Amino acid sequence: DVYKRQIIIPADDSNETRALLLLQQEGLIELPEGANAKDGVTTLDIKNDHGYKITTVQADTVAAQFANSDAGSLAVINGNYALAAGLDISKALAVEDASGDAAQTYANIVAVKSGNENLPKIQALIKALKSDDVKNFINEKYNGAVVAIF
């Protein structure tokens, strides 16, 4: 049945690409040779031999759409939205590889005005953010839903 083969993913450019890369990582679809997070891919680019019905919705609605979907459906849900929906990340069938192309491309960054990058307070902030204490906090607090890539 088609409804049992639905995969719900975020519709915005960056998260759609990330979702499709994850689905390819898990062998559910194929993307064009050399597809990567920086170039961006959409559902129009995929090879879908399994016949999944891939539905794109706003990222902040994926968890709710998934909760209301038929048995057998899958969803690719951003960690922050999965947490907000009360989902147990440890039960995820797949997670994005923290060292992978998508995670590295879409990681949060510290951006400062040009010329301020070497200010002592900026350097102190960067050092603190990259500390083992912060990494441990992220790992303990978010249990895999948010991953420190530093």
Predicted segments with their positions:
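Short coil/turn segments
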Residues: 11-14, 34, 113-117
